[in-house]
């Protein structure tokens, strides 16, 4: 058994000074105002104009963590410029040259933290996206407008 409830408990401390309480948390050498932030979400620009820039600016203003998705529709350089503590989540292709290019571009953009995502062993077959007319970056098409109206 991985978790035994009898080994975990809360210890109340009712007689302590609470005038200086805060939610600050340190993560990877940076102190943030909260122990939570924006997770990597590919395609936020579909939901909001320049969605990743909006999130990066909000994270910078609130001093909370923000990780840019490798599936973002925004340029990493622009997102990093909007938030000096933004991190980058990379889906690495199986090609060493492209991996090196990704890391070099992240370094040039100023990213200090890169999270490497390793949830699949083989790159996805995107034939269904091609047949459906999906392209990245997303471009307005009559079919896209029709799909949006239907949903």
Language model segments and positions:
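Phosphate/diphosphate-binding glycine-rich loops and adjacent basic-rich segments that engage nucleotide
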Residues: 112-151
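Glycine-rich phosphate/pyrophosphate-binding beta-alpha loops
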Residues: 40-46
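Active-site-adjacent beta->alpha loops and helix N-cap segments on the catalytic face
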Residues: 47-52, 68-88, 92-101, 105, ...
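Short, charged beta->alpha transition segments
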Residues: 20-29, 65-78
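N-terminal amphipathic alpha-helix/helix-capping segment at the start of soluble metabolic enzymes
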Residues: 10-36
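Hydrophobic faces of well-ordered beta-strands that scaffold small-molecule active sites
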Residues: 36-39, 64-68, 86-90, 114
